[in-house]
């Protein structure tokens, strides 16, 4: 099975081999050393400040999205939330659940956030900004420099979900003034699902320490304290953390985050050039290297997903809700090659020849 979804993705042989090993006991000096290296490499690849901290949460990306909303914002805040799709809507829901005062900036599907969209909120006393850097459901990559400039001018705390864009697109946490970054194990880290990662700068750490969170599992004060000794407050997904360590070391050996950015850019451009004569419309006006969102001109997007899965042994990423029949997505994350792109494109051409596209 060839996997072009946006998570889980194709893992390297080294990472998969660790998944076959016996999971070790983790309250040891050896595991603590691995976790401390995980923290440092995550900070290095996110280009975070030396005094930033990394927290590993056993849970999906949504677990860390919720932990961030709970720990860095309070009812005294006034937060702007960009909603350009399913995951922007999730931040809106989290603010509603935790009673964080917020204003939703609602975007049409596939459209980027613009300076004009932000203009009405200049100087209006907002204290927080929540953004999915790459709205994975629609394939839109937002202009993080523009958002950073807006937050800097208005003295706004900036929390960024980089779950699908981390390692795929250029990102410099320190230079952009991002206070919190979130990512997950199953995207470009190319490991099994189960771990989400939060990187916090000193301002975010101050907010966490001052906030009285009504949660045991999601209180980041405990996670930060335990992280000082390379541990977690509760039993983590030990095997996945060991796989993350192998993957981070793999990235380091292969030239670091810039090489990963370039590799995924090459894969995305290669795929997009190979499908230019097929009956698809790319629906995003501002794309990430992580994924290509496609609208079939003559067929159901979900039917294409099923045909590729059942008849060709290829997974692409379907959409849900209103977009299920309209858009499917092709990911460029993980252990893929231009030859894999050709295999997918040949399958699509075969479907076209059979009148299925």
Give residue spans per PLM region.
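Conserved PLP-binding catalytic core of the aspartate aminotransferase-like
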Residues: 280-311
């Amino acid at each position: 099975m060839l996997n072009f979804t946006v998570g889980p993705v194709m893992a390297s042989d080294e990472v998969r081999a660790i998944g076959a090993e016996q999971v070790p006991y983790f309250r040891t000096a050896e595991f603590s050393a691995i976790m401390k290296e995980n923290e440092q490499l995550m900070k290095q690849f996110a280009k975070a400040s030396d005094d930033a901290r990394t927290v590993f949460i056993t849970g999906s990306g949504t677990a860390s999205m919720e932990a961030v909303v709970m720990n860095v914002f309070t009812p005294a805040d006034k937060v702007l939330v960009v909603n350009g799709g399913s995951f922007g809507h999730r931040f809106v829901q989290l603010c509603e659940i935790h009673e964080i005062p917020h204003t939703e900036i609602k975007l049409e599907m596939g459209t980027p956030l613009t300076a004009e969209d932000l203009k009405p909120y200049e100087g209006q006393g907002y204290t927080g900004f929540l953004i999915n850097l790459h709205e994975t459901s629609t394939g839109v990559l937002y202009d993080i420099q523009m958002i950073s400039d807006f937050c800097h001018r208005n003295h706004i705390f900036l929390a960024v979900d980089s779950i699908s864009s981390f390692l795929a697109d250029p990102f410099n946490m320190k230079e952009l003034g991002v206070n919190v970054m979130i990512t997950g194990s199953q995207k470009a880290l190319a490991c099994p699902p189960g771990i989400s990662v939060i990187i916090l700068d000193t301002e975010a750490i101050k907010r966490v320490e001052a906030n009285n969170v009504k949660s045991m599992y999601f209180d980041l004060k405990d996670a930060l304290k335990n992280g000082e000794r390379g541990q977690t407050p509760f039993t983590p997904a030990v095997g996945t953390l060991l796989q993350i360590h192998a993957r981070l070391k793999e990235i380091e050996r292969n030239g670091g985050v810039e090489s990963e950015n370039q590799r995924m850019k090459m894969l995305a451009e290669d795929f997009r050039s190979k499908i230019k004569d097929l009956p698809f419309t790319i629906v995003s006006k501002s794309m990430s290297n992580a994924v290509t969102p496609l609208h079939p001109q003559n067929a159901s997007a979900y039917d294409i997903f099923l045909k590729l899965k059942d008849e060709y042994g290829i997974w692409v990423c379907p959409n849900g809700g209103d977009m299920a029949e309209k858009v499917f997505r092709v990911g460029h994350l993980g252990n893929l090659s231009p030859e894999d792109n050709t295999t997918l494109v040949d399958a699509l051409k075969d479907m076209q020849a059979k009148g299925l596209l």
